[in-house]
Design a protein with these regions (language model features):
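Beta-hairpin "wing" of winged helix-turn-helix
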Residues: 53-60, 65-67
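Basic amphipathic alpha-helical segments that dock to polyanions
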Residues: 44-49
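Key DNA-contact positions within bacterial/archaeal DNA-binding proteins
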Residues: 39
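Short amphipathic alpha-helical interface segments
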Residues: 9-21
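A short alpha-helical element within helix-turn-helix/winged-helix DNA-binding domains
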Residues: 28-34
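Residue cluster at the C-terminal edge of the helix-turn-helix DNA-binding motif
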Residues: 50-53, 81
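Non-DNA-binding regulatory cores of transcription-related proteins
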Residues: 67-140
């Protein structure tokens, strides 16, 4: 299940994507229009900035803006940033691999092999959904 933090990140990115490219948007405006608690949003925007998905400009006319084209930001990127591995078990993850305590041989485990396929298909589906797709759906 996607976390509330990841969902808010998606909403914030969608809001920024609807603004002119490179035009800073104040945190309070993002919070109000995307209906995200401001304090929570500040942490999310910092994570997005550290991941180079957004950048910020200081000052009276400052705020946050997208660093990537909305077409190049997908749900897999956001999910991994905020929620970690997509795999349902640690043994099915490449990045966070950890054998199950009750498994004798991970290479022969049929459950693991099926869950690796589920993870692959989930990643394909998440990568297909971009911020651009989402703002297109919302406005139609």
């Amino acid at each position: 299940m996607i976390s509330q933090k990841a969902k808010y990140a998606i909403k914030a990115l969608m809001y920024l994507a609807e603004k002119p490219q490179g035009e800073p948007v104040r945190t309070i405006d993002i919070a109000k229009n995307a209906r995200i608690p401001k304090k929570f949003l500040e942490h999310i925007l910092l994570d997005l900035k550290n991941a180079t998905l957004v950048s910020s400009k200081q000052g009276v006319l400052g705020g946050y803006y997208l660093m990537k084209d909305p077409e190049n930001i997908n749900l897999a990127d956001i999910y991994r940033l905020f929620d970690g591995a997509v795999a349902l078990l640690p043994c099915a993850s490449y990045k966070y691999f950890e054998p199950c305590a009750d498994c004798e041989d991970v290479e022969k485990c049929r459950i693991r092999h099926e869950l690796i396929e589920v993870k692959k298909q989930t990643l394909v589906a998440l990568k297909k959904v971009t911020i651009k797709n989402l703002i297109g759906r919302r406005s139609s």
